[in-house]
Amino acid sequence: MSGLACNSCNKDFEDDAEQKFHYKSEWHRYNLKRKIAGVPGVTEALFEARQAAIAQEKVKAVEAPMLYSCGICNKGYRSSKAHEQHLKSKSHVLKASTSTGEEDKAIIKQLPPRRVEKNNTAQLKGSIEEEESEDEWIEVDSDEDLDAEMNEDGEEEDMDEDGIEFELDPACCLMCDKKHKTIEKCMVHMHKFHGFFIPDIEYLKDPKGFLTYLGLKVKRDFVCLYCNELCHPFSSLEAVRKHMDAKGHCKVHYGDGGDEEDAELEEFYDYSSSYVNGDENQMVVSGESVNTVELFGGSELVITKRTDNKVTSRTLGSREFMRYYKQKPAPSSQKHIVNSLTSRYKMMGLATVQSKEAIVRMKVMREMNKRGAKSSVRLGMKSNVIRNLPNNVTY
């Protein structure tokens, strides 16, 4: 025993020359790769059988493909094994028993090799030069016009997608998807079963748009109506509904939050009736004292005249639309919905409008809580003791 061996291949050697020759072999390299991967090595016989199988597959890939067709069934196969299985099938045996011996012949044909189309750079350059040499020119708009058209198309597509995907019914409950015939019944249902309360309902001018906006926030954006300062959406509609039900957040964060939160809902309210001066006269915003002339729709001319006391406007139109000008339909108002809900809130003893004292008291309490929290943190840092620890912490 010379004591020379290979640990990867489990083979002994008689001299150094044989060992060095083994280290240069493909078998030893293959076993080294398996050893690095944590897999045991293979014997030399198994490695040679594997190499022979790989070489045979390469030869088959290089050889031209053959088509084995059956004269009786008129079917073709690309491999001999599939053709042999077809010959043993019941359908082929039944047809062979009823047919004559002339048709029972296997036809073997050589398929033409596949042509691989390679894009040569010279051919590409030639085709490009031919295209450039053609005298077919098309006038195009400037870049600004193209960008404007693309932006308009994109906006129209976005509006269409929003309208299709998120068509919300304002008469449908936000919490249980129960549909009602009118918006009034829907708002009464949400207040009775879910505690939904609308602040300053006396000044609500658009109940339909108000409920549609809240429905988009809950059903599309998965955002809570009350604790949405950070606008962190939930994972699903059921998650945000469970959160609002458990926390009692089935209400609108309006009147007691910041200016940014109130600005979201200001367009649905109209506080002009509450602006009263000392003489009990309603105060309105005075416009610019400039006379204006506006054209609407290409068929009407509106002349507006502003003075110190009043604003007058006249409309000049075509005679063909006189039958429409004579009609005076009553303006559609949603005030009856607001009035019914206001009376319902008052019957239950709920304040529809917050008093100034309550708002001032709320701001003072909020400021006191902030100062108390800061002082407790400062005292805890100074004494190196954290006061608000869990009950299971004894120190």
UniProtKB/Swiss-Prot annotation:
<dbReference type="InterPro" id="IPR041661">
    <property type="entry name" value="ZN622/Rei1/Reh1_Znf-C2H2"/>
</dbReference>
<protein>
    <recommendedName>
        <fullName>Cytoplasmic 60S subunit biogenesis factor REI1 homolog 2</fullName>
    </recommendedName>
</protein>
<dbReference type="Pfam" id="PF12756">
    <property type="entry name" value="zf-C2H2_2"/>
</dbReference>
<feature type="zinc finger region" description="C2H2-type 4">
    <location>
        <begin position="222"/>
        <end position="249"/>
    </location>
</feature>
<comment type="similarity">
    <text>Belongs to the REI1 family.</text>
</comment>
<feature type="zinc finger region" description="C2H2-type 1">
    <location>
        <begin position="4"/>
        <end position="28"/>
    </location>
</feature>
<dbReference type="GO" id="GO:0006355">
    <property type="term" value="P:regulation of DNA-templated transcription"/>
</dbReference>
<dbReference type="InterPro" id="IPR036236">
    <property type="entry name" value="Znf_C2H2_sf"/>
</dbReference>
<keyword id="KW-0690">Ribosome biogenesis</keyword>
<dbReference type="InterPro" id="IPR003604">
    <property type="entry name" value="Matrin/U1-like-C_Znf_C2H2"/>
</dbReference>
<keyword id="KW-0479">Metal-binding</keyword>
<dbReference type="Pfam" id="PF12171">
    <property type="entry name" value="zf-C2H2_jaz"/>
</dbReference>
<keyword id="KW-0862">Zinc</keyword>
<dbReference type="GO" id="GO:0000976">
    <property type="term" value="F:transcription cis-regulatory region binding"/>
</dbReference>
<dbReference type="GO" id="GO:0003700">
    <property type="term" value="F:DNA-binding transcription factor activity"/>
</dbReference>
<dbReference type="GO" id="GO:0005737">
    <property type="term" value="C:cytoplasm"/>
</dbReference>
<comment type="function">
    <text>Pre-60S-associated factor involved in the cytoplasmic maturation of the 60S subunit. Involved in the dissociation and recycling of other late pre-60S factors before newly synthesized large ribosomal subunits enter translation. Can complement the growth defect of a yeast mutant lacking REI1. Required for leaf growth under cold temperature conditions.</text>
</comment>
<dbReference type="GO" id="GO:0005634">
    <property type="term" value="C:nucleus"/>
</dbReference>
<keyword id="KW-0963">Cytoplasm</keyword>
<keyword id="KW-0677">Repeat</keyword>
<dbReference type="InterPro" id="IPR022755">
    <property type="entry name" value="Znf_C2H2_jaz"/>
</dbReference>
<dbReference type="GO" id="GO:0090070">
    <property type="term" value="P:positive regulation of ribosome biogenesis"/>
</dbReference>
<dbReference type="GO" id="GO:0009631">
    <property type="term" value="P:cold acclimation"/>
</dbReference>
<dbReference type="InterPro" id="IPR040025">
    <property type="entry name" value="Znf622/Rei1/Reh1"/>
</dbReference>
<dbReference type="GO" id="GO:0005829">
    <property type="term" value="C:cytosol"/>
</dbReference>
<keyword id="KW-0863">Zinc-finger</keyword>
<feature type="zinc finger region" description="C2H2-type 2">
    <location>
        <begin position="68"/>
        <end position="92"/>
    </location>
</feature>
<dbReference type="GO" id="GO:0006364">
    <property type="term" value="P:rRNA processing"/>
</dbReference>
<dbReference type="InterPro" id="IPR013087">
    <property type="entry name" value="Znf_C2H2_type"/>
</dbReference>
<dbReference type="GO" id="GO:0042273">
    <property type="term" value="P:ribosomal large subunit biogenesis"/>
</dbReference>
<feature type="zinc finger region" description="C2H2-type 3">
    <location>
        <begin position="171"/>
        <end position="194"/>
    </location>
</feature>
<comment type="subunit">
    <text>Can form homodimer. Interacts with RLP24, RLP24A, RPL24B, EBP1 and JJJ1.</text>
</comment>
<dbReference type="GO" id="GO:0008270">
    <property type="term" value="F:zinc ion binding"/>
</dbReference>
